[in-house]
Amino acid sequence: MAYNYRFAILLVLLSATVGFTAAALKPPVRTLNGNITLNLIWYGKFTPIQRSIIVDFIRSISSVTAAKGPSVASWWKTTEKYKTGVSTLVVGKQLLLENYPLGKSLKSPYLRALSSKLNAGGARSITVVLTAKDVTVEGLCMNRCGTHGSKSSSVNSGAYVWVGNSETQCPGYCAWPFHQPIYGPQSPPLVAPNGDVGVDGMIINIATLLVNTVTNPSPEAVSACTGIFGSGAYPGYAGRVLVDKTSGASYNALGLAGRKYLLPALWDPQTSTCKTMV
């Protein structure tokens, strides 16, 4: 029992929601709902395919296209059960910073400074800063995989989210269950649905932090369900998920352009349970 408890604590650390703890020390994010502009800043080198995986995920959140199975849009609808109500995300401006203008080692204040480079949508916006696999960020792999907060103390500044690509730095910490965990039972990792351990891991963390941002100040939306991706999950086991018959990849949500994603369970405030897609 003591071992299971310790491992459960470890899984909390493995989750991107550790970024929430860090974010809690920053100015609170104002409540966001309605139409929200989501700007993207790509810091470092991302391939066009990597960018499309992430952009397709964001566009899938508010898609009205019916999917033949569990979808990204239906996963997001759980956020409507929170006091913030309906939130529709629209991709705004994108900025590519492939020449590392601030270097390849970033301190935490740099993330907020970078997010201020795009302000489309004003107070009703979230700017997502994404750092490439060769960029080290203060705290990445040590106590967080991403974070979120307000761009500044101004109520009109909007929010920001940061997520790093952990592929070459700590995939067992920030890209589980697509990589064996750093500690605990070494069960075989799941096959990443888009064939990219780093980016598919980023999707989990982006999803986590976007939900935490729009449901703020209700941190339990994802953090209460850490490490759960399907029914029957327990520490070290992601749960029962769907498997692509051709690639063997694991997923639980369908997106636009035929994309498949693995998304974390969300806390359903109406049923007081962790809601999984499958």
Swiss-Prot record:
It is found in: Secreted; Secreted, Extracellular space; Secreted, Extracellular space, Apoplast. GO terms for biological process: response to oomycetes. Glycans are attached at residue 35. Residues 1-23 form the signal peptide. InterPro entries: EXORDIUM-like. GO terms for cellular component: apoplast; plasmodesma. It holds the Pfam family Phi_1. Keywords: Apoplast, Glycoprotein, Secreted, Signal. Belongs to the EXORDIUM family. May play a role in a brassinosteroid-dependent regulation of growth and development. This is Protein EXORDIUM-like 4. It comes from Arabidopsis thaliana. The lineage of its organism: Eukaryota, Viridiplantae, Streptophyta, Embryophyta, Tracheophyta. The gene is EXL4.
